[in-house]
């Protein structure tokens, strides 16, 4: 397992437990392991109860954190992937298709970063091209046609900023998704499972309900990007994070996020199954409520929610 810098003391105890577990078992060893396990639990509860916002960002990027492809088979059944935007190509930074949630059909769409070097390159580190947003929209429109709820999983450092992406209309593709998602006639639930950064996240993040895993973040810019603008150096990222209000708890207080999904003690990477179960229960509960509303009721609430964000004046 990989450890973050603030987890060094936890690592020391877990290394001791692992070392002792390989020793011939006797009563003395068993007692020592129990003592260390209790100490580890107390230390973890203390550590994770007072995380800084920057530490939450670090957890959201943990190399062992479950990605969309890890969670997909644990939450849904009968997944059938659908490919391509029918205009340019098939962007593998986003995966989508038909699936069942508790035996009910849904359209599931998620950003995938990739685990190792080969898969990271394949999925472009979760940074979608315009054809990715158009593929996602095509699947949403298909879901609308067949009256299926849409569930999206957000985990991206941002939309791909390359020249080719700009030439193919990156900003238009994202803007089009914002427009179309705000008016979809089926329930839409969006979940931030790791990084939810900039327009790259918004492009599949407009819906009736926005949920976040406990140790994820949702921001208009990464902490490093913000620090580079304000302080001319990314090294100030940990400082600016505190004033950005980008963690799940802070965004829940600001009413940007509707629900925070709890993670296992120590983060989602320590227990994929429990994380997936928590997500499945949360999404199922939201869809049950939304499915009992009429299209007019849902869209009216969605509109009111979107219009409540921020303030502006006409000059």
Curated annotation (Swiss-Prot):
<dbReference type="GO" id="GO:0005524">
    <property type="term" value="F:ATP binding"/>
</dbReference>
<comment type="pathway">
    <text>Lipid metabolism; malonyl-CoA biosynthesis; malonyl-CoA from acetyl-CoA: step 1/1.</text>
</comment>
<keyword id="KW-0547">Nucleotide-binding</keyword>
<dbReference type="Pfam" id="PF03255">
    <property type="entry name" value="ACCA"/>
</dbReference>
<dbReference type="GO" id="GO:0016743">
    <property type="term" value="F:carboxyl- or carbamoyltransferase activity"/>
</dbReference>
<keyword id="KW-0067">ATP-binding</keyword>
<dbReference type="GO" id="GO:2001295">
    <property type="term" value="P:malonyl-CoA biosynthetic process"/>
</dbReference>
<feature type="domain" description="CoA carboxyltransferase C-terminal">
    <location>
        <begin position="36"/>
        <end position="289"/>
    </location>
</feature>
<dbReference type="InterPro" id="IPR001095">
    <property type="entry name" value="Acetyl_CoA_COase_a_su"/>
</dbReference>
<keyword id="KW-0443">Lipid metabolism</keyword>
<dbReference type="InterPro" id="IPR011763">
    <property type="entry name" value="COA_CT_C"/>
</dbReference>
<keyword id="KW-0275">Fatty acid biosynthesis</keyword>
<comment type="similarity">
    <text>Belongs to the AccA family.</text>
</comment>
<keyword id="KW-0444">Lipid biosynthesis</keyword>
<keyword id="KW-0963">Cytoplasm</keyword>
<dbReference type="GO" id="GO:0003989">
    <property type="term" value="F:acetyl-CoA carboxylase activity"/>
</dbReference>
<comment type="subunit">
    <text>Acetyl-CoA carboxylase is a heterohexamer composed of biotin carboxyl carrier protein (AccB), biotin carboxylase (AccC) and two subunits each of ACCase subunit alpha (AccA) and ACCase subunit beta (AccD).</text>
</comment>
<dbReference type="InterPro" id="IPR029045">
    <property type="entry name" value="ClpP/crotonase-like_dom_sf"/>
</dbReference>
<keyword id="KW-0276">Fatty acid metabolism</keyword>
<dbReference type="GO" id="GO:0006633">
    <property type="term" value="P:fatty acid biosynthetic process"/>
</dbReference>
<dbReference type="GO" id="GO:0009317">
    <property type="term" value="C:acetyl-CoA carboxylase complex"/>
</dbReference>
<comment type="function">
    <text>Component of the acetyl coenzyme A carboxylase (ACC) complex. First, biotin carboxylase catalyzes the carboxylation of biotin on its carrier protein (BCCP) and then the CO(2) group is transferred by the carboxyltransferase to acetyl-CoA to form malonyl-CoA.</text>
</comment>
<protein>
    <recommendedName>
        <fullName>Acetyl-coenzyme A carboxylase carboxyl transferase subunit alpha</fullName>
        <ecNumber>2.1.3.15</ecNumber>
    </recommendedName>
</protein>
<keyword id="KW-0808">Transferase</keyword>
